Amino acid sequence: MLKIRVMPTLLSDGTKLIKGVGFDSWRGIGSPLQAVRLFNMRGVDELVFLDIRATDERRSPNFELIDGLADSCFVPFAVGGGVKSVEDARGLLLAGADKVVVNSAAVENPPLVAAMVKQFGSQCVVVSIDVRNGKNVTIHSGKKETDKNVVEFAKEMEKAGAGELLITSVERDGTMQGYDIPLIRSIADAVSIPVIASGGAGTYEHMAQALRDGGASAVAASSMYHFTGQTPLLAKRYLHDHGFQVREQWGQDAPHAR
């Protein structure tokens, strides 16, 4: 059995970190650099950084910002936001990203994912899919609903060569009430590439449910790390204690999560 991954998600407006609920009611929550440094000390398996305003503001990714963050990131670093071309993806990788996350452009320019895979390999390409009502793919930070069914789109992205899928429930985002397990399960059953559960994590048990009942390979979370005392390290400890194989990064005296 492959080891599961625990990964914080950092959302940015291009300069500062922000967080909302249901892709709305955004508020500033701090410095990207401080967060990257903090999470690097907290036993994360991977870090996801998304500039959620870049596409709507028709900006390219902030390569200078990513370059600075990558200097302080010593775990796999997945970066997205504003990726519209192979050159955007190349710029992020040159700036220090290990993986490129593509969202709206995967829907609006379907050949892009295959082109990125051809240039950089599947292991570098993550397709982020935001889902409303458990079935409809949305783009532009949830503002625009498409007619694409999420399961069929997930299969299309796998066929295009995507290395993994980041699945976020718009309604669950920021609520800390738990992941959309049926949504995650439907996609995990339809594809053979890793599925990252996102949107709604509020407890370590929510993560266990996404892995056990949803079939996810990894769990992403944001609000529960920013607004509670819960940490990725304790999440991994909890999951380990409940039978999941994790990358162990704690000392013998680390507390057990409850």
Question: Over which residues does each language-model region extend?
Answer:
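Structural preference for beta-strand elements that scaffold enzyme active sites
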Residues: 5-9, 46, 74-78, 99-101, ...
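Conserved, mostly hydrophobic/aromatic
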Residues: 11, 39, 47, 79, ...
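Conserved anion-binding
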Residues: 12-19, 23, 98-173
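Glycine-rich, proline-tolerant flexible connector loops at the mouths of alpha/beta enzymes
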Residues: 46-65, 104, 109, 166-178
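Glycine/small-residue-rich loop that forms an oxyanion/phosphate-binding "nest" at active or ligand-binding sites
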Residues: 53, 61-120
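Charged helix-capping and loop-helix junction motifs
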Residues: 60-67, 110, 143-152, 177-186
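Catalytic cores of alpha/beta
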Residues: 73, 77-99, 182-219
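C-terminal helical cap(s) of enzyme catalytic domains, especially alpha/beta-barrels
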Residues: 112-120, 209-221, 225-250
